């Protein structure tokens, strides 16, 4: 099937979701050669990936991922009750596509601790750096979080502390067949888009940052098809894959299978604009210091952008009714050192 798919995409034809599912199953099953994988993803990039193609690929990656179970089970002799199903507890992810090129610090990773401190279960999906100086896995490792842990430990972190890190290479083993072609090609492809769509914990609430404005509506449509209950897809007009403070942000607001588009500005929430340099990061050690400083209460643009993005996450998780309420809750979580406590708890629970 993959040879026929390559031929069709090269001719500018779109693949149906069912076709993409068949092709991705070949790739994930080790039945496609590196040359075929490389040809397909480059052809898709040149044509432009469609909603159906991305959705089909995401479904297969989800099916092949090692599942992380976030439900806590209560045994009351007569039966077991999944507490998360019964209470409809939200599970949130703050994973973005990366690739913005803005060299900012790890905003969404910092947000994860703030949101967890506000009572949201966070299944933070991430990886090492691909296009930036420091990915989420890099900064967490520099902070003291161990990445080489079993799924049972990740599940326990989420159950007991409300936050766990889902290290993509450990949970997407079938992706090993695409690693070589991706590395050798060296350009953004559909796989850069798929990471945030394939959380192994099945997070149904999400704030997803994207590196291109046209991906806002595309990935909002994909998330709706994949069952996202509430979420936002965001793109800063300065290039950031976050809600930004230096420019307006394009946003897709997802609610129960539908989405609406809007543009917001920092001033809408009483925040001052800043420069990209004010949000800059560095290597893993430097970014770890920045994260600790923010969670310890340091003021400035970095704190402000964390508060703003945390607010969107809290609205997505159903913990805040408005962005303003979310910002107040996030500020309280930081100022009372609850967010810092979540970081320290994750470090402690992941020690060998």
From Swiss-Prot:
Kindly state a single biological-process term from the GO annotations of this entry: L-tryptophan biosynthetic process
Provide a GO CC annotation, any one: cytosol
Describe the reaction catalysed, as an equation: N-(5-phospho-beta-D-ribosyl)anthranilate + diphosphate = 5-phospho-alpha-D-ribose 1-diphosphate + anthranilate
- Pfam hit, one: Glycos_trans_3N
**Keyword check for tRNA-binding:** no
What the entry lists under InterPro entries is as follows: Anthranilate_Pribosyl_Tfrase, Glycosyl_Trfase_fam3, Glycosyl_Trfase_fam3_N_dom, Glycosyl_Trfase_fam3_N_dom_sf, Nuc_phospho_transferase
Residues that bind anthranilate 1, according to the entry? 96, 127
- Cofactor(s) required for function per UniProt: Mg(2+)
Quick one: which residues bind Mg(2+) 1?
108, 242
Q: Which SUPFAM superfamilies match?
A: Nucleoside phosphorylase/phosphoribosyltransferase catalytic domain (SSF52418), Nucleoside phosphorylase/phosphoribosyltransferase N-terminal domain (SSF47648)
| Chain residues that bind anthranilate 2 | 182
The EC category is transferase
Report the cofactor remark: Binds 2 magnesium ions per monomer.
Q: Name the EC number(s).
A: 2.4.2.18
Q: In which pathway does it act?
A: Amino-acid biosynthesis; L-tryptophan biosynthesis; L-tryptophan from chorismate: step 2/5
Write down the HAMAP family for this protein, in alphabetical order: TrpD
UniProt subunit comment: Homodimer.
- Sum up the protein's function in the record's words: Catalyzes the transfer of the phosphoribosyl group of 5-phosphorylribose-1-pyrophosphate (PRPP) to anthranilate to yield N-(5'-phosphoribosyl)-anthranilate (PRA).
Similarity comment text for this entry: Belongs to the anthranilate phosphoribosyltransferase family.
What protein does this entry describe? Anthranilate phosphoribosyltransferase
């Amino acid at each position: 099937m993959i040879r026929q798919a390559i031929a069709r995409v090269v001719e500018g034809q779109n693949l149906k979701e069912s076709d993409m599912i068949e092709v991705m199953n070949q790739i994930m099953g080790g039945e496609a050669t590196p040359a075929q994988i490389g040809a397909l993803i480059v052809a898709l990039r040149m044509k432009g990936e469609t909603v159906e193609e991305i959705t089909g690929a995401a479904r297969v990656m989800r099916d092949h991922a090692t599942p992380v179970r976030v439900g806590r089970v209560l045994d009351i002799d007569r039966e077991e009750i999944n507490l998360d199903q019964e209470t409809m507890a939200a599970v949130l992810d703050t994973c973005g596509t990366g690739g913005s090129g803005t060299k900012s610090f790890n905003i969404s990773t910092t947000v994860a601790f703030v949101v967890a401190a506000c009572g949201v279960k966070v299944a933070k999906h991430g990886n090492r750096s691909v296009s930036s100086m420091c990915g989420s896995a890099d900064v967490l490792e520099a902070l003291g979080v161990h990445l080489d842990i079993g799924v049972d430990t990740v599940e326990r972190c989420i159950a007991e502390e409300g936050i766990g890190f889902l290290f993509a290479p450990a949970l997407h083993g079938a992706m090993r067949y695409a690693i070589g072609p991706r590395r050798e090609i060296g350009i953004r492809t559909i796989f850069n888009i798929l990471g945030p769509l394939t959380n192994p914990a099945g997070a149904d609430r999400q704030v997803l940052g994207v590196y291109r404005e046209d991906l806002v509506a595309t990935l909002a449509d994909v998330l709706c098809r994949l069952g996202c209950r509430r979420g936002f897809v965001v793109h800063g007009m300065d290039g950031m894959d976050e809600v930004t403070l230096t420019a307006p942000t394009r946003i897709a607001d997802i609610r129960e299978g539908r989405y609406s588009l809007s543009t917001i500005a920092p001033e809408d929430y009483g925040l001052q604009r800043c420069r990209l340099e004010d949000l800059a990061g560095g290597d893993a050690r430097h970014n770890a210091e920045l994260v600790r400083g923010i969670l310890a209460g340091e003021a400035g643009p970095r704190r402000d952008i964390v508060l703003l993005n945390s607010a969107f996450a809290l609205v997505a998780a159903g913990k805040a009714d408005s962005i303003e309420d979310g910002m107040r809750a996030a500020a309280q979580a930081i100022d009372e050192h609850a967010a810092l406590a979540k970081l320290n708890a994750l470090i402690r629970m992941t020690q060998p």
